[in-house]
Amino acid sequence: MKKGCVLLAVIISLGVLPGCSSRAPELSEIYDRVVELVEASYELNEIFYGDGLPYYGRNLEIYAPMYSDYTTEGYTRDYNIVSDLAKYHSVDEIKMAAERVYSQALLEEVVYPSAFTGLLISGAASGTQYVNARYVESEDDFYIYAGEDQTLTSPTPLIYDYATMEIVRPSNGERVLLRMTAWEEDAPDSPTTVKLTLTLSEDGVWLLDSLTV
């Protein structure tokens, strides 16, 4: 009996009892990280679902020659060349920025298909609709889709009230569910309650596992 008590004490001291390693963090441990991630997500949401990166207009005579030798086969009609003044100049650069904020799983399953590949959307009323990739590369050029049928337009950005942030169940040491008050940028008098999910990466870094739009 005595040996059993000693063994139990050792196990407790090592923190290896079932469930010990999955304890949800305290809000104070992740608060600053959540604020950092949400603030960084605004830029990414604009790139993926908003106006996107700046591009050269076809109606400007100075840029017309740039469109005369389009080589992006199958994409040329509604794609414009991303401006040299843009913050990002390739798919890889956008991905590097996105993967510092959003989880790999969320990006690969939800964001990247519409951003870089294109996808089919099925609807009962409209049937199957193809959504063009938002960004494509061809040789040394980087393009953004600018067609009138672009359907992935972001709603008005949400403003989060970080003071209302709280951890809710089910949460653990690798996945945290958060709840806080937010409102659309142009409707501060109409707050709502939203939920965000954090996930711990293999490198031990907290990332958003849900979109902030």
Predicted segments with their positions:
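Positively charged n-region of N-terminal signal peptides that target proteins for export
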Residues: 1-10
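Hydrophobic membrane-targeting and insertion signals
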Residues: 5, 21-23
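C-terminal motif of bacterial Sec signal peptides marking the signal peptidase cleavage site
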Residues: 16-19
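Mature, Sec-exported extracytoplasmic domains of Gram-positive
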Residues: 23-213
